[in-house]
Amino acid sequence: MRVARETILIPSGHSFRVLKWQNSVRAVECITGPGRAIQMRGEGDHWHFHTEMELTLWHDGSGTRFVGDHIGTFTSGDLVLLGAKLPHYWHASGLSSGLSLQWHFPEGHPFWAFPENLALLDLFKRAGRGIRLSGQTASSVSQYLRELPVAFGTQQLALFFNILSCIVSAPPQDCTVLSLRSFNLPLESRYQMAISKAVRHLIAHFRGQVCLEDLLRITGLSRPTFARQFKQHSGRSFSAFLNHL
């Protein structure tokens, strides 16, 4: 069973991607400039991962947050930094709105030619387990995020660096690590969509009777393969995941 990989396209002329949504994380806008946006299908409402890092702010809404092996609740103002290849899923209980900032600076990228940026290496590594930001750090970062959709060019780039500067200098009490372990999932697999289907089924039916046989049918996996892949890619056994819900 395998989590779905999302392929993210950074808009031409930009170093990162800014997403904005109203009502539902399934319907997002990719901001391409002041007053300009591309409508697209959001991926945050199912179990997925991507090679890009992500910073997500929930303006309004509440629900359940899944980050690696972490399961917890979120409310308005929730702000989470996600590292590359970290599986995640937001299950909103109703209407919601928010912003996401996504970027990818692999080894050898010109971003790392600036020696000042090397201080971010440890932060990006820690983000591989997910970091919930709070306190003054969250307040400052959230304000910068809200300004991103109406900024452009060097103004937007300056906001981006302000965000990174706030997070990397945040006091420990403002940073809560979410997942017990980091993940390094393969980019391609024949199990790619199965975990997403299984998790969605569990979320939809956990208050009633959940039958393992139904999950095996949905995913098309044998019992041993299901058990092995579920734990490998969610960080929990099937029973532990279900009990935590």
Question: Where are the regions that the model predicts?
Answer:
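Basic/polar phosphate-binding segments, predominantly the helix-turn-helix DNA-binding elements
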Residues: S179-L187, K197-L245
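An amphipathic alpha-helical interaction segment
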Residues: N117-P186, M193, K197
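Short hydrophobic/aromatic patches on the structural cores and recognition surfaces of FHA
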Residues: G61, G77-D78, F226
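Residue-level detector of short, conserved catalytic/binding motifs and their immediate flanks
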Residues: M53, D78, H88
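A hydrophobic/aromatic-rich effector-binding and dimerization subdomain
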Residues: R2-A27, A84-E147, P172-Q173
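Short acidic-glycine-tyrosine-enriched beta hairpin
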Residues: D69-G83
